[in-house]
Amino acid sequence: YAEATQADAKKVGIKVNLKNVDYNVIDGIARKGEFDLVISNVLTLQAGDPEVFMNGYLKTGQEQNGSGYSNPKFDALSDKLGVEFDPAKRRELIIEMQKLILDDAASLVFGYPQTNMVSNKSIANAEILPCDYYWLTKDIKSAN
């Protein structure tokens, strides 16, 4: 995505210098403000509920909030979400939080990379799950 962003920016007269860094230092660079644009990826949505992701990456003061995004209204909605258990009400809160993220341009979503899992006929039950963890499960076994 970085190279594509660089190429697109060049088309409109913006020079982009790319700096590849180890994933372990990205959040630190972001927290220190040592960037103009950080491209990082997060693939895991552990349970199909975005609360963990939204709070961790977008709530004010959270360690993983490397962007420095801060919006008191988002934080208040996040606090409400943390104590709300009714699925319909949680959905409403999440939608409102997502609208704030979009309106504030807090995050740019480039897409979702295609992932492939390849095995030969000696392996059975190898399948990709809807999150990036647990690809190797108790169900994967020798086909023999």
Predicted regions and their residues:
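Periplasmic binding protein-like
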Residues: A7-L58, I94
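Conserved C-terminal helix/tail region of periplasmic/extracytoplasmic solute-binding proteins
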Residues: K10, V16-N17, G82-V83, A88-I95, ...
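Bilobed periplasmic-binding protein-like "clamshell/Venus-flytrap" ligand-binding domains
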Residues: E34, V38-N41, F85-K121
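Bilobed "Venus flytrap"/periplasmic-binding protein-like clamshell domains
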Residues: Y1-Q6
